[in-house]
Amino acid sequence: MTEAPTELPPEDRTPPREPGDAWVIEILREIEEEALRHFDPRLLTALGRYIYTRHGDTLEGARELIRILQRALFAHFRAGCGHSRIGQTRGGNPLSAIPTPRGMH
């Protein structure tokens, strides 16, 4: 049996790169689309203006907006959003239809 080769760092010894511009913009569009399903558009517009005044039209501003929207959506889902099963106690376990093995009650 042969051993797997060990993984080596990049030849130029540079640190890992940040995600590319296109990737950040794509993620921002996706998360904004999701946020519009759950939050008032006026709130999102105000948040966007706030980020723009702090960071301008930069990738750092886009990353900050992504971080804030991710946290807001997570908290919203945990609080029991009707569009999500995250954080909901009602409805039961989707695996409950599978019978429990004997002796595991």
Curated annotation (Swiss-Prot):
Gene3D superfamilies: 6.10.210.10, VpR/VpX protein, C-terminal domain. InterPro entries: RetroV_VpR/X. Residues 1-20, 85-105 are annotated as: Disordered. Keywords: Activator, AIDS, Cell cycle, Host G2/M cell cycle arrest by virus, Host nucleus, Host-virus interaction, Modulation of host cell cycle by virus, Phosphoprotein, Transcription, Transcription regulation, Viral penetration into host nucleus, Virion, Virus entry into host cell. One of its GO terms (biological process) is symbiont-mediated arrest of host cell cycle during G2/M transition. It is found in: Virion; Host nucleus. The modification Phosphoserine is found at S84. Residues 10-20 have a biased composition (Basic and acidic residues). GO terms for cellular component: host cell; host cell nucleus; virion component. It comes from the Viruses. Interacts with human UNG. Stimulates gene expression driven by the HIV-2 LTR. Prevents infected cells from undergoing mitosis and proliferating, by inducing arrest or delay in the G2 phase of the cell cycle. Cell cycle arrest creates a favorable environment for maximizing viral expression and production. This is Protein Vpr. It comes from Human immunodeficiency virus type 2 subtype A (isolate NIH-Z).
